């Protein structure tokens, strides 16, 4: 039986795309290799949002040249965002690559790679970066090899916002949304398995259907979708990522308040606290409008947890601009923040701007902002210690397989002792300790000692929120 291995870089949408590709291979009689060493086909699903992500993928590709020499019949492919953006360059420079497919070809990866494996006489790379009508509708399969309580559902592809720093409209194309009924049927199928929570995915997820579907009775297509999915009884939690502040109209705020399945967590990317930088980024809102939105959300959902994305070192960012971002963090007090150093992306407006900041300045500002946020994160996390929360137990902790992990409705990660009876179940847990980014808890169920403690030192320290 032939085998396939996929190394995935980047966001959750890339992970979801890889899942689709793997399931297509399974349906063709392949098995998923546990390591690239055992694979007949090796694919790298790539990311282009920052230079570091591309560098990691290129390094991985270069490291596989030896494997290709040892086994010329090995099929080696590059797929995803970097393939879309730099595919022909990659095929020309790395001639040992057999396959380069863009972001609108995920549904064809298995077929093409399988044909290449059956044809060892390959004279050149197979490259296809073309657009394909309705390709966004094809990301609808989930791995049949393992049951999970949480499933990610792609509801749209692409982005039409064209922020000045962002390469996504180039790599993913303009936004295209799947029909509500198709998404509903996909989630119904998931609900018939072990899935209890779904996470809806889109580059700008709350712009779902903006071009394709009408508002009905004052409700956007996205809210219509949320309401329909909430009727599936087995689905107890619904999340979505990643939204844009401009997409939070009154109907969505009301839905967050009124639909019980919608979790009390919103990821709200602000990117900067400076009006000058926000305008240069083409974000479409001011600092004051963002703060007003935060106020509306918190008034509607008092238990709401907020996370955000921030870019430091955008071209032309002065110390005063940076201080405005620092003050915004202190004013909003996000539960978590993902802080990134600006990375110039060729072809974007920001990459051609003057006054590009040095890497030294970017690193220094990144560090200072991270210090502020880490302090806020710890202060907010400490307030949860001693409280009882409900978690959905996902399975083994990513940092320590001898423990289980789960998440609260507010998206806080909780580590608990491992017990197979709890896998995939909702569990009441008392929070006994926190590192800020991670909570540690004691399950509160019949026959379990509430005072049960376990060695926190066994856990590997959680990764910092900056990447």
Curated annotation (Swiss-Prot):
PANTHER family: CDK5 REGULATORY SUBUNIT-ASSOCIATED PROTEIN 1, MITOCHONDRIAL TRNA METHYLTHIOTRANSFERASE CDK5RAP1
Domain of life where this protein originates: Bacteria
GO CC, alphabetical: cytosol
Binding of [4Fe-4S] cluster 1, residues: 11, 47, 81
Protein name: tRNA-2-methylthio-N(6)-dimethylallyladenosine synthase
Localisation: Cytoplasm
Cofactor: [4Fe-4S] cluster
Domain MTTase N-terminal residue range list: 2-118
InterPro entries: Elp3/MiaA/NifB-like_rSAM, Methylthiotransferase, Methylthiotransferase_CS, Methylthiotransferase_N, Methylthiotransferase_N_sf, MiaB_methiolase, rSAM, rSAM_horseshoe
Annotated residues for binding of [4Fe-4S] cluster 2: 159, 163, 166
Cofactor note: Binds 2 [4Fe-4S] clusters. One cluster is coordinated with 3 cysteines and an exchangeable S-adenosyl-L-methionine.
Primary role: Catalyzes the methylthiolation of N6-(dimethylallyl)adenosine (i(6)A), leading to the formation of 2-methylthio-N6-(dimethylallyl)adenosine (ms(2)i(6)A) at position 37 in tRNAs that read codons beginning with uridine.
Annotated EC: 2.8.4.3
Residues in Radical SAM core domain copies: 145-379
Organism listed in the record: Methylacidiphilum infernorum (isolate V4) (Methylokorus infernorum (strain V4))
Top EC group: transferase
NCBIfam families: miaB-methiolase, MiaB/RimO family radical SAM methylthiotransferase
Gene3D superfamilies with a match to the protein in the record: Methylthiotransferase, N-terminal domain, tm_1862 like domain
Protein family per UniProt: Belongs to the methylthiotransferase family. MiaB subfamily.
Disulphide bond pairs: none
Catalytic reactions of this protein: N(6)-dimethylallyladenosine(37) in tRNA + (sulfur carrier)-SH + AH2 + 2 S-adenosyl-L-methionine = 2-methylsulfanyl-N(6)-dimethylallyladenosine(37) in tRNA + (sulfur carrier)-H + 5'-deoxyadenosine + L-methionine + A + S-adenosyl-L-homocysteine + 2 H(+)
Assembly and binders: Monomer.
Domain TRAM, residue spans: 382-445
Keywords linked to the UniProt accession: 4Fe-4S, Cytoplasm, Iron, Iron-sulfur, Metal-binding, S-adenosyl-L-methionine, Transferase, tRNA processing
GO MF, one example: metal ion binding
